[in-house]
Amino acid sequence: YQFYNMDDKDKYVYKSIYAGCARAVDFLAGLDFVDPDRIGVTGGSQGGALSITTAALNPKVKCLAAFYPALADLTGYLYGRGGGWPHTFRNGYMATKERIETTYYYDVVNFARKISVPVFYSYGFNDMTCCPTSTTTVYNVIPDVEKHLWIVPETEHWTYPEQMAARSNWLMDQL
């Protein structure tokens, strides 16, 4: 699914996914039992990417916690470095002009530049799914907001229970 309609930036599957996440926050904020001033987003991998894009697109999001976000530095392989999941251009045959241009619109790095809320961020150096070069790039472009970074060098595409507990405690403090 991650390559569905990738030849057209206006029809690419992530257009509706990103928009759907932003609209979901509006829906939640409208519920009687939800305090619209206490909405945060969190996730890992694709969920980390969606947390970042959602926080960038919807000002109702008050904080963001992300683990090893996917969909970051997607064209990295074209420039001799690792790219993030889904590794679109790892083998080169997918690298058409249209697909490359489409990724510029959906790369999480571009959304991270728009973050204006506190951030909890964690990843490891051994992740082969969302390589550390791509996840570091995302973190480095997040503007000067309150940021909490926890690098756990030995981890791969997973987290320790202590990371999850720290994230949960941080979210509770923020919200």
Model-derived regions, located:
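Cap/lid segment of the alpha/beta-hydrolase catalytic domain
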Residues: 1-19, 76-84
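Alpha/beta-hydrolase fold nucleophile elbow
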Residues: 33-45
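Alpha/beta-hydrolase-fold catalytic nucleophile elbow
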Residues: 42, 67-68, 152-153
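Hydrolase active-site cap/lid region
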Residues: 50-96, 159-162
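Active-site nucleophile elbow and catalytic-triad environment of alpha/beta-hydrolase enzymes
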Residues: 96-111
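Short beta-strand/loop motif that positions the catalytic acidic residue
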Residues: 115, 121-123
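Acidic catalytic loop of the alpha/beta-hydrolase fold
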Residues: 125-130, 157-158
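C-terminal catalytic histidine-bearing segment of alpha/beta-hydrolase fold enzymes
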Residues: 136-175
